[in-house]
Amino acid sequence: MRMQSNPKADLLLDVRDLETHFYGEESVTRALGGVNFHVKSGEMLGIVGESGCGKSVTALSILRLLPKQTAKTVGGEVIFKGRNLLELSERQMREVRGNRIAMIFQDPMTSLSPVHTVGRQIAEAVQIHGRVSRAEALEKALEMLRLVRIADPERRLNNYPHEMSGGMRQRAMIAMALACSPELLIADEPTTALDVTIQAQILRLIVDLKDRMGTAVMFITHDLGVVAETCQRVIVMYAGRIVEQASVTDLFARPTHPYTRALMNSVPDRRRGRQSRLPEIPGVVPSLREPLVGCSFAERCPFAIGVCREKMPVLSEIQPGHAAACWRSNEVVNL
């Protein structure tokens, strides 16, 4: 089921029934099983869930960056500004990547080339998508380093990635991603490898730049606290499917899917006291190598009944803008 959106809203990205498979020698992993969501211009959308739930695969499917030998998007549409990205030629897609849609990856050390200076790498991104000279591109790179608040940007322009701290490298990645003023920025766990203080700085930087440049952000994370602080809407994913989506305010006020409630309960809370044991979600995520029968969360769910193991629930609206894929959502939401 696709949630109804405001027809007057400025829809930037519309993902419809997206399905992606990974192929092994003797098996097929159904990594995404019909994902539907949209991103509006200028908004910050959070995508949360445990590792392996399909968050990063969704992003890579949108940008068609999956390894062609082992993965394929087998169904659905990715409509960006009225065009289906899955139908574009590779040349047309290169004009979109890094230009109209940019992505920040988890580990900047492996995303940046170790044999080129940071300035050259940012300048190259500018030259690929704009008709500018090398000198103009380097000037733009310097401007971007200033924008992301890197100290002594003139010197850092000529640094190699290994000469910079983790926080500086991530700032450089943000500078590169935003150098061509994209309409959509996909940030895939951009603070995972950083310490807590630097994480907060990078998050604040992304939000500030979003507001300043008017860029929409699709923020992938496992941290609900980050979502609460930075996003307007949130999608909760589990086993390659969306199990709940709502505004951040509604989700935290009325978590409706049992998995969402379990995620929230597993977050440390000072009100529980030091001696209380942190709740955990029992069991494991089901294998996606076999077709799922029933709800994918049923074996881990304290609310599961017979129908949950027999029939897959569809994403249904609980109230305008808030939907969950749960047979017992009307009961769970009132607990």
From Swiss-Prot:
Keywords: Amino-acid transport, ATP-binding, Cell inner membrane, Cell membrane, Membrane, Nucleotide-binding, Plasmid, Transport. Residues 15-264 form the ABC transporter domain. The keyword Ligase does not apply. The keyword Transcription does not apply. GO terms for molecular function: ATP binding; ATP hydrolysis activity. GO terms for cellular component: plasma membrane. ATP binds at residues 49-56. It is found in: Cell inner membrane. SMART domains: AAA. One of its GO terms (biological process) is peptide transport. Gene3D superfamilies: P-loop containing nucleotide triphosphate hydrolases (3.40.50.300). SUPFAM superfamilies: P-loop containing nucleoside triphosphate hydrolases (SSF52540). It is a peripheral membrane protein. Probably part of a binding-protein-dependent transport system y4tOPQRS for a peptide. Probably responsible for energy coupling to the transport system. Belongs to the ABC transporter superfamily. This is Probable peptide ABC transporter ATP-binding protein y4tR. It comes from Sinorhizobium fredii (strain NBRC 101917 / NGR234).
